[in-house]
Amino acid sequence: MSEIGTGFPFDPHYVEVLGERMHYVDVGPRDGTPVLFLHGNPTSSYLWRNIIPHVAPSHRCIAPDLIGMGKSDKPDLDYFFDDHVRYLDAFIEALGLEEVVLVIHDWGSALGFHWAKRNPERVKGIACMEFIRPIPTWDEWPEFARETFQAFRTADVGRELIIDQNAFIEGVLPKCVVRPLTEVEMDHYREPFLKPVDREPLWRFPNEIPIAGEPANIVALVEAYMNWLHQSPVPKLLFWGTPGVLIPPAEAARLAESLPNCKTVDIGPGLHYLQEDNPDLIGSEIARWLPGLA
């Protein structure tokens, strides 16, 4: 495997969305269907830095920073999932994206799947990895992270850990990559959240993960898009790693059998942030898959 690059060689782009500025990467040719890359918690478009160069020679690549994250503005919001839905919906409309191919991860997957379910005629394909799905019981949450995430979802304790101690950036992120992240990479991920006041999204997201039936509104929403995925013929490309976190190998095998029109790719060793362990394979497989989309 080639050395994993730490640089972010993309010019900044900004668009006003609901009165706030959202930052995004925008590279590649303007003709054809754009590829929309959606990150999750606690990352940004930086997560896609080594994947986009594989796709940009043939397709327009757009990678926003979710509101309150990366280089996007940080308005005073509760940062519920519905807040991110509003801003992402408006972002897609502001850029005039009629049809897209989605490349999605973590909470970006929930946002992407939810958008696709509501706009199926505008989705040409979905590439996904380590995505948000219903977790029926805490026993099915990875053991190494169980106590940590239970603490995150305990009112005052969770806020102290994530807001005051920055535990999602300093703890969860590096522990969910097989290789050691460099200080340069860690500093890129730290930069948007140097001030505790800016860490609200990092705290809200783990409290919205649909585990053991809570929170009920997110469980219902995620179950709805999972039902849609199991019925939709849209081409799907699922990346998985070993041991994985949200999508362990056994779950990937089940999904390969149950999802229509789904190709799977084993990236080898990987935890949650697969893009940091094998970006070249992910990027090259997306680039190989795209020409086959109708």
Curated annotation (Swiss-Prot):
A GO cellular component entry from the record: membrane
Top EC group: hydrolase
Active site: 106, 130, 272
Entry's EC annotation: 3.8.1.5
Coiled-coil region(s): none
Positions with a binding annotation for iodide: 41, 107
Catalytic activity: 1-haloalkane + H2O = a halide anion + a primary alcohol + H(+)
InterPro entries: AB_hydrolase_1, AB_hydrolase_fold, AB_hydrolase_sf, Epox_hydrolase-like, Haloalkane_dehalogenase_2
Pfam family, any one: Abhydrolase_1
Disulfide bonding pattern of the chain: none
Span of domain AB hydrolase-1: 34-158
Entry GO MF terms: haloalkane dehalogenase activity
Keywords noted in UniProt: Hydrolase
Quaternary structure (record): Monomer.
Assigned protein family: Belongs to the haloalkane dehalogenase family. Type 2 subfamily.
HAMAP family membership: Haloalk_dehal_type2 (MF_01231)
Free-text function comment from the UniProt entry: Catalyzes hydrolytic cleavage of carbon-halogen bonds in halogenated aliphatic compounds, leading to the formation of the corresponding primary alcohols, halide ions and protons. Has a broad substrate specificity, which includes primary, secondary and cyclic haloalkanes (chain length > C4).
PANTHER family, alphabetized: CIS-3-ALKYL-4-ALKYLOXETAN-2-ONE DECARBOXYLASE, MONOACYLGLYCEROL LIPASE
Name under which the protein is recorded: Haloalkane dehalogenase
Classification lineage: Bacteria, Bacillati, Actinomycetota, Actinomycetes, Mycobacteriales
